[in-house]
Structure formats: C-alpha cells, structure tokens
Amino acid sequence: MSARMNTSRPLWPWLAGLALAVTAFAHDRARTPVRIPDIPGYRTLKCDFHIHTVFSDGKVWPDVRAEEAWREGLDAIAITDHIEYQPHKADLPTAHNRSWEIAHAHGEGLQLVVIRGSEITRAMPPGHLNAIFLTDARALDVPDWRAAVAEAQRQGAFIFWNHPGWTGQQPDGLSRWYSEHTELVASNQLHGIEVVNGREYYPEAHAWCLEKNLAMLSNSDIHSPLNLDYDLHAGDHRPITLVFARDGSPDAIKEALFARRTAVYSGTLLIGREEFLQPIFERSVRVLTPHVQVRGTGRAYVQLHNESDLPYTLHPATGDADLQFPRELRLPAGRTALLEVKGRAEDRQGERTIRLACTVTNLLVRPREPLHTELEFKVTLLPK
C-alpha cells in the first residue's frame, strides 16, 4: 500500500490546471473579421452608428458595446444614447457624455474607433435624429428641437434621420417626408437617413437618399446585449454601414460620411450606389477557370470563387445561338460555385470571349432594382 502511495501523484494540481484552462478558454477574446473587400482608393470600414447603453434605455454597460463591436469585426461605432429619454435616471445620473467616455476608453485598447454621439428624441416630425462627432452632448439638452439640431451643427456633427418608418411614430410602417425634413436639408442640417434600422428596410428612405443626395445608413439601434438580438454563431449579424474611407481614422470616417461614400449591409442585402456596389462585387468574385471547352451539345463548368462574407444570387442572361446558361446561380460566402455552360449545336467551333450579363438580385442600387454586372471568361467550341 505504501509503495503504491509513493508512486502515485496528487490529483489536485491536475484538476486545478484544468480549471484554469477552462476558465481561460471561457474568457477567450477573439475577433471575427467581416470579409468585404476594399474598393479602389478607399478602405471598406464596417460601422454601427446607432447604439444605446444603460445611460439611456439600453441594458448594457458602455465598455461592453466596444467589446461586442470589436469581436464582431467592426472598425467603428457611435454611442448614441437618448438626450431626452432617461428611464434609468433613478439608478444612474443623467450624464450625456459619460457613456461615450467609458466606451471610448475601452475601444482605444482595441484600436476600435468610438465616436461621441446622441439621439435627439422628438415627436414626428422631425422624429428621432442622431448627431455624431459631437464635442459635448450636454449642449443638445434644450427644449426646442431646432435649437438642439443647430447646436449639433455648430459642433460639426454629422446628422441623420433614424428609423423613418418606425411604427412607434408611423403606425402603418410607411416612411413620410415632411416639410421639416425639407427645412433640415436646405439648412445643411440633415446629411443622411437610416435605410435600414435593426431588421427593417425602408425603401422610401432608400429613394430619398438618391433623390436628395444623402448618405445611406444601416445601424443596429441595439439596446439589449448583442447576442440576444443576433444569433452570431449561426452566421447572423447586426446591420452595419459600410464607409469607404481613405483610412481608419475618425477624421477619415467623418469625411467619407459627409461625402456620402456609404453602403448598407443587412442580412444578405447590400444596398448602395452603383459606383460602390460594382467594385465590391468585382473584387469579391474570382473566375478560377477563365477558359473552358465545350464539345458539341456537352457541358463545361466555370468555377467562380466568392471571397467575401456576402452570398450573391445571380440571374445570368440565358445565352445565345451557341451557348446557354442557368437562370439562377448562387455564390455562397467564402465558397466556389459552378456556372454551367452548355452547347446548343453539334457543329460549332472556335474560341469566344464571353461577357455574360447578370443581375445580382441581393445587391440593390435602387428600390427593387438589382445591380447589373458582367462575368468574363473564354469558351472554346469544339464539334462533336
């Protein structure tokens, strides 16, 4: 018995080590990048400019918002607690700058840009407006909404209209343009509109952004912990604004917003001006087999690799006298798909350069109008 006891090892150090390893794993901090390509001349930054904390009606401490965003692969966020709506003031003092100060300090350690903002929370019209790149949110706490907006403008803020079709202010869910919004645009006090808020898409707002040259925004308006609203492990994600900026600095983001260089990424939809969506698609999709052979009425397959996190749904042109193509092709995110090329006749021969016209149905350049693009490859036709 004593010999066995001398050769055995105590169990507790091993158990303690296991416990430490499990604890370390449970608290592992890791970032998942959002794979959407840069476009010529600009970086594609992933941003959320509408976020709440416990300092208004949110349920999360501000530093958690920075941590969530960094882990989800975002480059910048804005903390935009309500100015007028303070339901937690019995537990927390009203301190309009404090949530940004806490989140900003945490974001600095993660190299995440955290922008100071506020939500000017008024009845419709004009509704709720976000002002970001503020220098002092306290100055917006005034009775008159026009005075609040004028103060935001004086501070150099970028101002946008939140959730224009929100049923809390528009019970039928339809976005409506009021004379107050015309007034704001005319005085350079409205620079963008949320085309997407949470899981809601507002086609009227999409059209207004194009008509009135306003920036398109897509934001979460998150109140709860992120993983309660979005099933991240199943591939779900918050809506984000893509900002095409010269670099990742706050100044570059602000310049890009005022220049309207933005797009909307929500679910599997990408919404924006063609000048931005076209290069994103072209830089996402790579033709792996740019030259195929088709013998007679046989088939060949062009391999298309999608390097982005965006799935694409293509509707190719049906073909011509020599070749035919499928009516629909799905390009899953991060995977390679096969485009079938089928011959129509037994006796065709020669080499052709194909510029296959396609619509990308989940990339919208206008409401209900998909992006039109081309896929280029070569086909050698051989007689059977």
How would you describe each model-predicted region?
Residues 6, 52-54, 178:
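Compositionally biased, intrinsically disordered low-complexity segments enriched
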